[in-house]
């Protein structure tokens, strides 16, 4: 746009009404490389036609998808108006991960960026809209990307839902910008964009929103709709619009986005917005019943246009220009032009010689369909705002179907001026479904100038210096923005003040911020260029918003010594606020001291101490006034010495005049002692300085006057004493520097002034409580709220300045930004030392500097405050005009495009097999001169000929049933196969070419990897024969089977018998979804009822009805299970005959399997439900798969027991110097102390964690040892369990909060033996220990359980990074999981864990997911009487009819239909009376005595250790501990046949957030030991996650967390197979989990898995050799320093980039929060895995939560490496 005369207004013009809407911002992205409004306007004026060919990548998947597409796509219109790089998007700017960006419709991406640009064009800080009621209405109509992604069903992912939905476009904008107003997608076909504008207007008028973002977007990705429009004749083959032209034959489709920002005109004027145009009115209608739904309707268009004019209160004859829809269709254009003529032309009485101008933007940028209306509106706005009638592109000969001679309309051929005073335009839009929209706009109101105002060139006052801000979401972007600004600022004529204003409050303020302070344009450009080069300058600021930013800044008013000759002179002349503050105290100072502060500052008269004191105060209150006038406000204040007076004034305790009175009277008294004192700054801590004074006998003559920092202080006293002390310190090489003063401030020298000062100021001040936080440096308690009365100012004069205390208090209160308000920084260094000592990342910076330009310094300080994130009202300092011409955001685009799996097009092999028919028959070729037929196809993941998964050793293979089905389909005449040999499975590990060859009845399947083509192209060496056989057409006798009699003959077995068996031998999944619903027999004969499509009805089978593969797959799979007694994975190897009855494939069938006596040959008959045979497989032989574990081996891989091998001892032990015991005094404590004292280790005993507050836990070599001691009464178990956990948590929290180097050790005795209730109470500590070790390894030493009275010195000193240790016979041992050896199988046991029909079984947590699954399994296993105990219970049975949605009721009904009797008892056994209440409930049931108990009750409330509360912890602990003890009371040991506890392996592996849950489960494990010691038949199952069930049910996050720990979940069936397997072994704790494999020489993520994690067999290859070579040459990790930091930053950034799928580590901003870059909770688990692998350091699960950026992680790893 050449110029933008739109303006902000004072008073509204009388012709504008309250319903007028201001258009204040616009942006677009259109074909022809149009990226801005200016480029769009230039394209219109130059009549540019942006049409062209569609980019090749758009339709490429459709060429691959189906060979038939190629021919049709060649006939489809491929020309149109396309964006250059539709796939490009700046994902990182919006904090969107590459993975999510790839799954987002490009329309969402474009709309997001263009919306941002529109808001910037409007001069709105986008980030300021967060939380507002801003509305978003976006027109959208294309679902091309959605179809592309969702039709690739195997590739569908969760994010594709919102990522490709229409609603996702406005909703994504609202979500990203945190907008809370209406957010709606508008689909009105081609009218969508203008309808969205209408809805935005309505939302503003209704008061729903104060701002509306409206527009439309369109993307042309797939050919489908273009093909539709081709068929309908709507688009022209040339892909070019020719609106109003006689040659028009249809439209050219266009893509892009256009967005406008709307606000009520009255509010836009108040807000100082620059109005581009006024939306006077709009209307939307529908053409109703017409000749056809897609036929345009002239009458409807006229009606809607007149309604819009009526709403706008505009005379149609005052409208000089109409932007028509004008798609260039033969029917649409004449109809629309006639409607326009009726409303605006001759029909309205317009003279022919003054025609209404019309035009259409479509020949320039195409028909954007959903974005067409908003694009037309932008063109119209540009026309009225620039006062130009825009010329029509592609217009030569007027359309002869239009009555140009009489309609009083004229198409604009060339650029012409718009001379009317009041420029108005109409905009038309309609959709092919009948929606009609119309809008009326008017030029922006002109500004109202007063009579004295200059009209013409605006004269700006000199606002130098200038503060220019810019910011970015990531630090790397700052350079690009600086470069862009430098170039533009150097060329533009816009006033620098306007540019500064725009950047300050009309641009978004991101986390990474820069600022420069410049006196003029040349300096600004130079500084910006330095910023673009990442160089530094004294007047440049580069910061990231601090964590302390929101808290605000602490203003620190320093004391004596900051003065310099010309201080304040510049400010008196240029800052009214400064002059006002100083002048307000001038008379007071004159009266008391007989001099004028104003004159003294003007003349630089600061020679005497009294003037220095008063002028220090004057400068500070003046600077405070200036800072506040420029929008800064203190959040807290600190005063240093005399600076406390100005601090108290700033805090509201004193008036400025009271402060002046105090400082003047004090200064007058200082004249009495001037010349008698001196002060020196020394490099000694205040404590060391006191010792030094004592050594030299100077304590009476010299005082520690100022506690400057932890390592420095100021000494004050008489001149001789200071001289002597100074020399003595220098002799000791202790730095001492003179303070420029002749008064011994804050020393006994001033005692003589106390009474005179009190007398002088008494009654003259009325101190108030501070209005903001005020830290004292005169009181020992910095937060003291003492009134700043007369006594306070006496203390302030004499007592030491406790600056360090005040700064520490502020840091403890989470302040971190300090601004020294003084004429020169004199205490910044000291404050910085305190900040560093506190291990804070706080900052301190000055307001002014000696001999530097004062206004420039103040602006620099404001810039520092803002860049650190301190709240500032920027409008207070930047109050002038602004310009929308400041460049918008620089996008860093990367391509994001989902490559869908639509197959790969091969030369001459474009026809692939029919996936739904489950065959591999592709393109058919007849070999000339022979009877050989060949079919060729390509097999890969996208052409998988079966719907499920069929892995073998982790490699997906094609099921044998598909191969058999393929052979049967090689000819319609075939109904049988003979002599089938299945040699090698067809693997799907890589794309391969398949050939099916049929020759003289013999068929074979051969393949070759595509990767091998070209290498052996002329040989047969790379072709592999998989399966051979003969096809036949034989008559065969079909037998029948009496189904009912066979069922009675064979024993009933659970339906999952075959699939359970297959899973146990390593086949967890089936290639087809068949399901066994009934199963009989498990010996030499079996009968199975199979549903091949259990989720489908007879009429909706999800595959071709001609496919025999699903039922053949069930037959071959079930057939192999007949050998279950000798479990090993078997695959079909040979088949004598397969026979079928063509056309009679049943959905539900019976499979009758028999084995030939004495042979390994299986015969399978496939029968319909009447028992008639429809197919058979005879003579099927199997081959065992080498290396596949058998059934027992497979279950053994799930069930493990705990072992305790000796721990590895470190060569250099921990230097133990001090042990702080937390324990009651006891014989054990006494023995430990005596043992340690012999080894020269000091000891302290505190009775509880609170006692640690008084202990020094920061000294080297110190540990905290917690010794639990409880009661041997069983009834006290729950109480002490809670107490022990609570105390350990308190200690851990204290150490974490203090950042103490001391580690916590928990020392128990006899816990693992579990012979006493006391050891039982300690059981939860085992689980708690592992969670603390996981979340806070920095404070955890270990839990050590001992078997004697000796202190476990070996464990504490020499065992490193082990969370739990067992010391037995003085040997430290560590926990490891081991497989349960077969030698432990126990036979002939008297007791069992298997339920029977005679028993009564009780399940706690019985209505929970695991409880119900246990109930189902027990009934399946024979149980017929169950009692389900639950806290919530169920409604009375009479109400069950209304509770169909309750899964518990549904399950119970099913179990009762199976013959079981189910009783539900509502009882909370975690309560103190839980046992009694449960006993009463059982008595009422009057059932036989309980035979077995399953304790599955539990509650989960995840909380991190540092955040957990005792209430929450106990809620989780109680069901496990109190619940188990209640059952223990009801069912003493040896009174049950079995007792089963449901625990969790999470406490072994340290799952974060599960401190309470792990503690409860660890108790159950100890409880199992405790009862086992008493002869009970009990087992505790430490479960991993069950897929989709329980409190740790598998979710994406849980699965990722499990994998990070080195394990995975188990299925429900696997869990109960593990139960059955575990009961064969005499183990009391069965750990059930599946360990993930690691490399042959690799290390599992957790040491406890070391002995059970499978090892991958290393492959010897050239690639491996190269890899090893690369590893061996890898540079060593630097030891420390900058090299280590750089190494870690690169390594961690690479891990982050890998997790987020970023192009490279360079795209990772080390200071940006990972969540802002798009990382979610699942990704954090993956990142931990990458970090552990890369850096060989164990990473706590909570690390990334507490270390949110790469820089934070670098700091953590620096300490670890």
Swiss-Prot record:
Region (N-terminal hotdog fold): 918-1038
SMART domains: PKS_AT, PKS_KR, PKS_KS, PKS_PP, PKS_PP_betabranch
UniProt GO MF annotations: 3-oxoacyl-[acyl-carrier-protein] synthase activity; 6-methylsalicylic acid synthase activity; fatty acid synthase activity; oxidoreductase activity; phosphopantetheine binding
Origin: domain of life: Eukaryota
Span of domain PKS/mFAS DH: 918-1191
Residues in Ketosynthase family 3 (KS3) domain copies: 18-443
Record field: catalytic activity: 3 malonyl-CoA + acetyl-CoA + NADPH + 3 H(+) = 6-methylsalicylate + 3 CO2 + NADP(+) + 4 CoA + H2O
Knockout-associated phenotype: Abolishes the production of arthrobotrisins A to D and arthrosporol A. Displays significant increases in the trap formation and the nematicidal activity. Develops far more adhesive trapping devices and traps and increases the number of captured nematodes by the traps. Shows significantly increased ammonia levels in fungal mycelia.
UniProt pathway annotation: Secondary metabolite biosynthesis; terpenoid biosynthesis
Active-site residues from the entry: 190 (for beta-ketoacyl synthase activity), 325 (for beta-ketoacyl synthase activity), 367 (for beta-ketoacyl synthase activity), 641 (for malonyltransferase activity), 950 (proton acceptor), 1113 (proton donor)
EC assignment: 2.3.1.165
Induction remarks: Expression is down-regulated by the cluster-specific transcription factor AOL_s00215g275. Expression is also down-regulated by the HOG1-MAPK pathway downstream transcription factor MSN2.
Coiled-coil blocks: none
Stretches for region Disordered: 1654-1680
UniProt KW keywords: Acyltransferase, Multifunctional enzyme, NADP, Oxidoreductase, Phosphopantetheine, Phosphoprotein, Transferase
Region annotated Dehydratase (DH) domain, chain positions: 918-1187
Cleaved signal peptide residues: none
One GO process term, biological-process aspect: fatty acid biosynthetic process
Residue ranges of every copy of the Carrier domain listed in the record: 1686-1761
Positions where O-(pantetheine 4'-phosphoryl)serine occurs in the chain: 1721
Annotated segments matching region Malonyl-CoA:ACP transacylase (MAT) domain: 554-870
Function as written in the Swiss-Prot or TrEMBL entry: 6-methylsalicylic acid synthase; part of the gene cluster that mediates the biosynthesis of sesquiterpenyl epoxy-cyclohexenoids (SECs) such as anthrobotrisins and arthrosporols, metabolites that possess a novel hybrid carbon skeleton consisting of a polyketide-derived epoxycyclohexenol combined with a terpenoid-derived monocyclic sesquiterpenol substructure (PKS-PTS hybrid). The SEC pathway plays an important role for fungal soil colonization via decreasing fungal nematode-capturing ability.
Protein name (Swiss-Prot/TrEMBL): 6-methylsalicylic acid synthase AOL_s00215g283
